[in-house]
Amino acid sequence: AHDLRSPMGSIKMVLNMLILSLPPSQIGEEMYQMLSMANQSTEDVFALLDNLLKWTKSQIGKLNVVYQDFNIVENIASVIEIFNLVAGIKNIKLRYLGDDKIEVHADIDMMKTIMRNLLSNAIKFSYNDSEIVVGARIVDDSVVVSVRDSGKGMSEEDQRKLLNTETHFSKYGTNNEEGSGLGLLLCLDFAVKNGGRLWFESEEGKGSTFYFSVPLKE
């Protein structure tokens, strides 16, 4: 996975640049759609490799938590900006509702990994022309970050299996996007390692909301 990550990162960067610099009016709608599909596939593979590497390191105790005090809202905004392009392929709007500044005590990279996975999943299971709302609010001595979609949702049986290492699974997204099911387990692991937790609410056919909490700056 480590040997594949660098070349995949280069391919991902080139495809992103092409999509940004070559609008449909210049290369035609069909070619633009093919380019968008290639970009999405590359994003999925890169995310899988990244999750696999981090999960492996975490399980063998080689991934240390580096605590810092930082504004998690800036962290959230940077991830949303990255995913605007991916969401745009399905004409999905990403919106943030919350305070402009919430200082937390956590590992910056791990928080970004959680946000990337939750947003990626929300886009994957959302329908075209919909909206995903990201929120952040202070609850007691923690911040609770939420990612809400109005997509496929989950059955009660799937909800019971989702965050269990023995029964976790993966399903196709609304545009037949693939996944490994590993991302949410990594999110759960990182949330707990930072003194927080991860949970969700879902209703089949109506969508899901995923939450994670981390301690506020003291």
Give the ranges of each region predicted by the language model.
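Short alpha-helical segment of the dimerization/phosphotransfer core of two-component systems
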Residues: 37-45
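Short helix-loop "hinge" at the ATP-lid/N-box region of the Bergerat-fold HATPase_c
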Residues: 122-123
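Helix-loop junction within the histidine kinase core
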Residues: 56-67
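Short conserved segment of the HATPase_c
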Residues: 154-168
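Conserved catalytic submotifs in the C-terminal HATPase_c
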Residues: 66-71, 77, 88, 93-102
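Coiled-coil phosphoacceptor/dimerization helix of two-component systems
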Residues: 44-55, 75
